């Protein structure tokens, strides 16, 4: 198995981000985005996907959370894309159904080289902790764009925290399955992903 680890940075006038990712990790994480609820979601993502993940963000959260969440999604997606290399041997697709109390999420991914996001979930309130709820969808769109994955998300429930958390957990489990190396082929009739 190739070494599927990567360390990348992204620096703009709005954010300064450093991410270390080990796809074949143990679910260990150190996350500091400046947004406690977002940290909690990314920690859940790391734990349930068995990805080792370090994220440090210095973002303009005095403005709002948009740039921090968007740019973290962009860089994390790029980390996955680079760590997977030519994608030889991976399952390519994965899905998961995750419950949490009254909430349920189904997430399916295809590491196809084509970016697309379907997000079928709604939140009752404008904020979940210190995060604007509309930026949750934007995180997944940003992640899908740079990872070049198709991500299809469906979630329902009554508690916004639970809905958001089951989405992150279901994505993690889906990606854990999709990134597993189980053969020596590139699963595409084109010969590349």
Swiss-Prot record:
Compartments, as annotated in UniProt: Cytoplasm
Top-level taxon: Archaea
Xref: PROSITE patterns: IGP_DEHYDRATASE_1
Record keywords, A-Z: Amino-acid biosynthesis, Cytoplasm, Histidine biosynthesis, Lyase
Protein EC: 4.2.1.19
SUPFAM superfamilies in UniProt: Ribosomal protein S5 domain 2-like
Pathway terms, separated by semicolons: Amino-acid biosynthesis; L-histidine biosynthesis; L-histidine from 5-phospho-alpha-D-ribose 1-diphosphate: step 6/9
A single GO molecular function term of this UniProt record: imidazoleglycerol-phosphate dehydratase activity
Catalytic activity entry: D-erythro-1-(imidazol-4-yl)glycerol 3-phosphate = 3-(imidazol-4-yl)-2-oxopropyl phosphate + H2O
One GO cellular component term noted in the UniProt record for this chain: cytoplasm
Main location: cytoplasm
Gene Ontology terms: biological process: L-histidine biosynthetic process
Gene3D superfamilies hit by this protein: Imidazole glycerol phosphate dehydratase, domain 1
PANTHER family: IMIDAZOLEGLYCEROL-PHOSPHATE DEHYDRATASE (PTHR23133:SF2), IMIDAZOLEGLYCEROL-PHOSPHATE DEHYDRATASE HIS7 (PTHR23133)
Family note: Belongs to the imidazoleglycerol-phosphate dehydratase family.
Protein name, UniProt field: Imidazoleglycerol-phosphate dehydratase
Gene from which this protein is expressed: hisB
């Amino acid at each position: 198995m190739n070494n599927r680890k990567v360390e990348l940075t992204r620096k703009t006038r709005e954010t300064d981000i450093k991410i270390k990712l080990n796809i074949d990790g143990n679910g260990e994480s150190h996350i500091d985005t400046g947004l406690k609820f977002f940290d909690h979601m990314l920690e859940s993502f790391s734990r349930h996907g068995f990805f080792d993940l370090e994220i440090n963000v210095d973002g303009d959260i005095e403005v709002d959370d948009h740039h921090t969440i968007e740019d973290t999604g962009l860089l994390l997606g790029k980390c996955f894309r680079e760590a997977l290399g030519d994608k030889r041997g991976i399952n390519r697709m994965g899905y998961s159904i995750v419950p949490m109390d009254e909430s349920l999420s189904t997430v399916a991914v295809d590491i196809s080289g084509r970016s697309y996001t379907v997000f079928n979930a709604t939140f009752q309130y404008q904020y979940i902790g210190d995060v604007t709820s509309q930026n949750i969808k934007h995180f997944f769109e940003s992640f899908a764009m740079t990872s070049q994955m198709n991500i299809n998300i469906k979630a329902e429930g009554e508690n916004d925290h639970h809905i958001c958390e089951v989405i992150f957990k279901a994505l993690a489990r889906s990606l854990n399955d999709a990134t597993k190396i189980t053969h020596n082929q590139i699963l595409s009739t084109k010969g590349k992903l």
